[in-house]
Amino acid sequence: MSRVGKLPVKIPEKVKVSVDGNVVKVEGPKGKMHFPTNPLVSVQVDKGEVKVARQDESHVAKGLHGLTRTLVKNALEGVVKGYEKGLEINGVGFKAEVKGKEIHFTLGFSHPVVFKLPDGVTAEVDAKQTKLTIRSVDKHLLGLTAAKVRALRPPEPYKGKGIKYADETIRRKEGKTGAA
């Protein structure tokens, strides 16, 4: 039995969970989301808890059992608290600016870089325009969006210029030394 999957997930107050076939729908104070589940796994809602069970004992079903339970837990936590990820922009003249559903970056290229935010994701920049905070109720979409933003200008190892996660440490390299 999956040690993660067998644990029931408690439904917080002000959250509504429904299962429609293979689609789990979650609504809460911060927003709503839905995601599909695999037919090898069944999801039931009863007495303020969500329980996940697998249909057979195959290796694939065992893996999907724990995954589905974690996806349900993340969805419940997301619609109540929400998720956020911080990014830092390092480099001379590097900055970001949020305009509606777009982030405009100045990253040392000959042109500004425009990044369109997906639905359900919001962003804000601090006063210095070097710290970017991305928020969403969907943990997966948040991580994907943060990775795409970081990929616009990944940090380089010599001076550390680029976009990095707030909690990321860049392994620095030493530059060339002159011939003796």
From Swiss-Prot:
GO terms for biological process: cytoplasmic translation. It holds the Pfam family Ribosomal_L6. GO terms for molecular function: rRNA binding; structural constituent of ribosome. One of its GO terms (cellular component) is cytosolic large ribosomal subunit. Keywords: Ribonucleoprotein, Ribosomal protein, RNA-binding, rRNA-binding. Coiled coil: none annotated. Belongs to the universal ribosomal protein uL6 family. Part of the 50S ribosomal subunit. This protein binds to the 23S rRNA, and is important in its secondary structure. It is located near the subunit interface in the base of the L7/L12 stalk, and near the tRNA binding site of the peptidyltransferase center. This is Large ribosomal subunit protein uL6. It comes from Anaeromyxobacter dehalogenans (strain 2CP-1 / ATCC BAA-258). The lineage of its organism: Bacteria, Pseudomonadati, Myxococcota, Myxococcia, Myxococcales. The gene is rplF.
